[in-house]
């Protein structure tokens, strides 16, 4: 009887974070089925997770919160608070560069919901991403976030953004972590968008076709292809 109880306990504790596998979450990202991400994040019991599982969940929260900014401002506000709470809980376990890169994204999300405080948030965004780059400019996530800052900021440089995206793509390719495959696809998407903005549409079209050939279910990339003409 005790063995059965132990088996049930182990099964339940494992389910605290394993509602969806990294592969399923990656496929959901490609197919733009973010309901899967929402269910996965909502079902995770933070206190029951290992440090590594918490780090992986934080990365999914980073991505899903960005998605929700364009869907539901009230829910996005709640997710930002949760994301920040989890980031603070992992401050000592994360590499310092990643901590400051994630913190930069939190201020970016807040700015997305509160344009009245542009200068306040912009300063914190740049301070944290610049510090992250100083600490480790060979971290793929850090490079990708620096690229995002350059790409989306009205004061940024699309040319520099492209260089950061290219470097991040290369770093993600060499690291090949399943739970970060979606991050690489996000980088590839903004890389193509950056080429379009720089009026390098032939190059953008070639890369776009290449990425779709590699991942035929990549919906956002397929939607981007007509913009390359």
PLM region spans:
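Sec-dependent signal peptide recognition
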Residues: 2-9
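N-terminal signal peptide c-region/cleavage motif recognized by signal peptidases
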Residues: 13-16
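Amphipathic alpha-helical repeat scaffolds of TPR domains
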Residues: 20-24, 47-70, 94-113, 137-154, ...
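Short coil/turn connectors between adjacent alpha-helices in alpha-solenoid helical repeat scaffolds
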Residues: 25-35, 65-79, 108-122, 152-162, ...
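Primarily a tetratricopeptide repeat
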Residues: 39, 78-81, 85, 120-123, ...
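Amphipathic alpha-helical segments of tetratricopeptide repeats
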Residues: 42-46, 84-88, 92, 127-134, ...
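Eukaryote-skewed repeat-based solenoidal scaffolds used as protein-protein interaction platforms
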Residues: 106-153, 164, 168-174
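Terminal, low-structured helical/coil segments at or just beyond the last alpha-helical repeat
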Residues: 178-229
